[in-house]
Every structure is written in structure tokens, then in C-alpha cells.
Amino acid sequence: MAYIFALIFAFVVCINTDVIQAEEIQHDTLRNMEYRLSCTPKNSECERMTDICCPGFQCLGCNPYDKNDVNKCKCQ
């Protein structure tokens, strides 16, 4: 009898673990989607200290230490 209860308990724990993992994967996917919607695409103007370029690109083309630079950077 104890063997049957142990199997049922193991089965329930396994199912709950799979559900938790599926929720984490779905949450991670939503977080990535929000990040990609908020990132600055290629060749768009960006500010080096505040904007986030989309993955694979960097905010380049300006010098924040040069007072003559108008800070027109682009995600490249």
C-alpha cells in the first residue's frame, strides 16, 4: 500500500514540476519579446548612455567627451 502512495506522490510531484517549468519558459519568452519591442533597431539614432540597441548592435558614431559632437549616434 505504501508503495502505491509513493508512486502516486512521485507522479504528482513530476507533473507539478513540469507545469512550473512550462510557466518559467513562457515568462522568459514574454520578457524577451518585451525587450525586443523596446530595443532600438539597426541604423536608428540612439543615445549612448540611455538607449538599448537590439541584440547584435552597439550605439556607435558619437563621442560623449567631445563638446562639438552633437551626439547623433546610430545602432550599428
UniProtKB/Swiss-Prot annotation:
Source species, domain of life: Eukaryota
Tissue specificity field: Expressed by the venom gland.
Keywords: Disulfide bond, Secreted, Signal, Toxin
UniProt GO cellular component terms: extracellular region
Subcellular location per the Swiss-Prot or TrEMBL entry: Secreted
Record note on modification: Contains 4 disulfide bonds.
Name under which the protein is recorded: U-scoloptoxin(13)-Cw1a
Organism: Cormocephalus westwoodi
Phylogenetic placement of the source organism: Eukaryota, Metazoa, Ecdysozoa, Arthropoda, Myriapoda
